[in-house]
Amino acid sequence: MTYRLEPAMMYMMPIHFGPGMGPRQGPQRRTFECKDSPKTTSVSVSFLTNGEQLETLLPEGFELGAEPVVTVYASYMKEIEWLAGRGYNVLGVTFPVEFNGTVDQAKGNFLTVLWENLTDPILTGREQLGFSKIYCELPDPLTFEGDTHCT
């Protein structure tokens, strides 16, 4: 007996495992309200660098945006509804770019790499959004004597 794909459902590979649950689709096609979640703490640092070095990271059609400023950011998310109240941490590196295609133009941040410390959001983000994500250990920040430390 063969299986039939349900058009309104979201699938991840391999599709014969059935519809995939994740942040954009819960059980019985339920969407998540995320009214008071996630609880997020974010930190970042930005620095001016050599634009020619950044340009070597860009695919064809992209060019460096305003200034060659790299931003390294970390976000620590807790109480995420689609993760049954669990959370995860991310660390990303971005810089401003412009895309000037024959039809479309856009300005934004180019995400060079994104590290995460939980498999569920890595798989769903890669499969459903096309983000290239890498697993790594990202401990929560520690606060000691009024100073917050991220390692």
Task: Give residue spans per PLM region.
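Short basic (Lys/Arg) and small-residue
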Residues: M1-M10, Q25-C34, E67-T151
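Glycine-centered flexibility motif
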Residues: P14, P59, L129-F131
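N-terminal ordered "arm"
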Residues: G22-Y76
